[in-house]
């Protein structure tokens, strides 16, 4: 950031140094000799004559362009001098008493131009060569005879322009082409004829100027509003044709130089202040990083996460690393209630997802470090791995694995993406159930997720589902899991929230089971949890209860792919949905029971294998006695395998299996 600012500063100074001479030497080449600006001021002083005011203003600019075309064959000045001429004309008119409101209303610089471009024609030669212009030249031959000669000229010009640029052209283009036509005709005639033609084209009068006004007249004092020789006089507007002796330009050159230099110095001071402030912020951030690292438990910076065949170090990132990896936080890939997620590419090649926490409480660094210490020890193939964290003043950042295929929500509901197959959906359902089983049964103390939804289920490059945002339960000082008091706001997403939790505000693992059931129903139907303003669970009740209507629940995009075997699997999965979404938590199965039934529905061999393993270990035999699987159309669960111990501030789920991960 500092290097970029310094480079920008040097480039700015170099640009100003190269542009300063051109700014000081800039001059408008248009000749306004004999232009009666006093007449313009008189006409424009009457607000009822706005149209006439604009015609006079336009006429004087057009005759000056015609004179310039006589010398250069160009219909106006070059682009780099256009703004200079407009500014000079505006100042000159103000010197004669024409108000800024008048020049603004008439569009000096936007409608009244000093550079004519008529459908790509910018020179006298191009206009003469355009089709139909010869007819205009013949009808506008001067001097005009008494009668309808002017009208004949105008009608010829109108016909020419309509054929040239079309009848539907906007007014600005039409006016520009009219001015270009006049300038082309007037560029090859004398001043008297040019003024006569001007009166016809713009319907203006009183333009006759005494011949002596065209001779050089010395101005006794510098005028504050001269343009190419324009200076107010006591009798009439008279102009000197020699710009080299114009005192106005001699006084403007140092003025412009002083202004540009002052602006450059001001910008230099501002940039120096900004650079010093940024340096100070970065120094403070690095100092804070060093300080907070001392408060992090010693196990955190060197904690290793071993998952399958990969390993990576959990570490603390500096704020500078965060800003560089996210391009100053300009790589947003997602946003939710708990923070904004950015894609980050670190210098060591690590590609990660960085979550900036939205709601940061007045939480001590040690408390935050203890919580991320808890999260860092959660490692499972179906949980998004936490790679590290960052603390910057009151800002908190969490660094996770980057999931290439986005969220389940994107694949189910995004327009233009192919829908996941039935097999892929069931695989995702089992992956999520595995993650929840780990949180509920294999952590010590057990954890609840609290916000299971399709957008929190991420997919890696192989479409392995991983649960994210599982850090919503906080660790207390004694190591137990803490939740907010009863009067806290309800957390979760509409459509996924356990209705029992909404009433009691007491969180249990059965709340996760309910949310999982909604996700499972979302996988079956391909519809959102709240669809068309209605709750998906309530909307699906009549299909859940009748086996004959199970197939009607299926996403229409994949319904044809479900065969007889898939139909039996569908019946089992629908039964799981119905049981998971029971209104009372005690009527719902545990996630372990859900996982077993899903695995059996996908692979019948799994049932015998699971039974053999359980008999071998022995610890789960009492749970199986509580699970009643009836033959027929549906499976009914008995009492849950886990009893919930409820507390406002802490809770733990009993029956954590032996060899469960402890921290």
Curated annotation (Swiss-Prot):
Stretches with biased composition (Low complexity): 640-652
Cytoplasmic side: 276-663
SMART domains, sorted: S_TKc (SM00220)
Positions annotated with a glycan in the UniProt record: 36, 46, 70, 101, 171
EC number: 2.7.11.1
GO cellular component terms given for this protein: plasma membrane
Bilayer-spanning residue ranges: 255-275
Domain annotation Protein kinase: ranges: 327-609
InterPro entries: Kinase-like_dom_sf (IPR011009), Prot_kinase_dom (IPR000719), Protein_kinase_ATP_BS (IPR017441), Ser/Thr_kinase_AS (IPR008271), SPARK (IPR043891)
Location in or out of the cell: Cell membrane
UniProt-annotated catalytic positions: 451
Entry's family note: Belongs to the protein kinase superfamily. Ser/Thr protein kinase family.
Record's protein name: Probable receptor-like protein kinase At1g49730
């Amino acid at each position: 950031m500092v290097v970029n600012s310094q480079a920008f500063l040097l480039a700015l100074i170099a640009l100003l140094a190269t542009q300063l001479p051109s700014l000081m030497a800039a001059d408008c080449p248009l000749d306004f000799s004999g232009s009666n600006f006093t007449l313009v001021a008189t006409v424009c002083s009457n607000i009822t004559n706005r149209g006439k005011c604009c015609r006079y203003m336009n006429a004087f600019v057009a005759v000056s362009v015609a004179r310039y075309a006589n010398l250069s064959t160009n219909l106006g000045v070059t682009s780099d001098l256009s703004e200079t001429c407009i500014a000079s004309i505006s100042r000159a008119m103000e010197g004669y008493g024409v108000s800024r409101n008048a020049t603004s209303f008439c569009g000096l610089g936007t409608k009244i131009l000093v550079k004519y471009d008529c459908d790509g024609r910018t020179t006298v030669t191009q206009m003469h060569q355009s089709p139909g212009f010869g007819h205009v030249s013949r009808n506008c031959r001067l001097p005009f005879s008494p009668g309808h000669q002017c009208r004949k000229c105008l009608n010829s010009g109108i016909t020419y322009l309509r054929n040239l640029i079309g009848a539907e052209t906007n007014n600005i283009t039409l006016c520009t082409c009219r001015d270009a036509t006049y300038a082309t005709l007037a560029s090859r005639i004398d001043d008297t004829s040019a003024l006569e033609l001007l009166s016809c084209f713009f319907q203006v009068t009183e333009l006759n100027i005494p011949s002596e006004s065209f001779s050089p007249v010395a101005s006794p004092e510098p005028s504050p509003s001269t343009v190419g020789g324009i200076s107010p006089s006591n009798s009439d507007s008279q102009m000197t044709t020699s710009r080299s002796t114009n005192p106005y330009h001699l006084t403007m050159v140092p003025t412009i130089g002083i202004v540009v230099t002052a602006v450059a110095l001001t910008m230099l001071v501002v940039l120096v202040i900004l650079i010093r402030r940024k340096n100070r912020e970065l120094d403070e951030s690095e100092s804070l990083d060093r300080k907070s690292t001392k408060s992090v438990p010693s196990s955190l910076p060197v904690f290793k996460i071993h998952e399958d065949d990969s390993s990576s170090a959990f570490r603390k990132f500096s704020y500078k690393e965060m800003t560089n990896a996210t391009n100053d936080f300009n790589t947003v890939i997602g946003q939710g209630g708990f923070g904004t997620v950015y894609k980050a590419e670190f210098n060591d090649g690590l590609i990660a997802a960085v979550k900036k926490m939205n709601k940061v409480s007045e939480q001590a660094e040690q408390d935050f470090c203890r919580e991320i210490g808890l999260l860092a020890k959660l490692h499972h193939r179906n949980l998004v791995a936490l790679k590290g964290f960052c603390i910057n003043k009151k800002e908190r950042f969490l660094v996770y694995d980057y999931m290439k295929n986005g969220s389940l929500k994107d694949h189910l509901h995004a327009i233009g993406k192919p829908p996941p197959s039935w097999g892929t959906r069931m695989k995702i359902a089992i992956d999520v159930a595995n993650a929840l089983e780990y949180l509920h049964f294999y952590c010590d103390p057990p954890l609840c997720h609290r916000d299971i939804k399709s957008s929190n289920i991420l997919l890696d490059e192989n479409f392995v589902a991983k649960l994210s945002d599982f850090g919503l339960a906080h660790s207390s000082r004694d190591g137990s899991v803490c939740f907010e008091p009863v009067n806290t706001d309800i957390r979760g997403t509409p459509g996924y929230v356990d209705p029992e939790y909404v009433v009691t505000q007491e969180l249990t693992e059965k709340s996760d089971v309910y949310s999982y059931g909604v996700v499972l129903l979302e996988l079956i139907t391909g519809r959102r949890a709240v669809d068309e303003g209605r709750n998906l669970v309530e909307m699906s009740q009549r299909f859940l209860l009748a086996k004959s209507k199970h197939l009607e629940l299926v996403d229409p995009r994949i319904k044809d792919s479900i065969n007889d075997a898939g139909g039996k699997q569908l019946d089992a999965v629908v039964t799981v949905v119905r049981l998971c979404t029971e209104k009372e938590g005690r009527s719902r199965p545990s996630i372990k029971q859900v996982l077993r039934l899903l695995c059996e529905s996908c692979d019948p061999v799994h049932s015998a294998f699971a039974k053999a393993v359980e008999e071998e270990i022995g610890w789960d035999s009492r749970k199986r006695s509580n699970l009643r699987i009836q033959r027929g159309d549906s499976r009914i669960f008995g009492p849950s395998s886990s009893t919930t111990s409820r507390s406002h501030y802490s809770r733990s789920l009993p029956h954590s299996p032996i060899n469960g991960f402890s921290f």
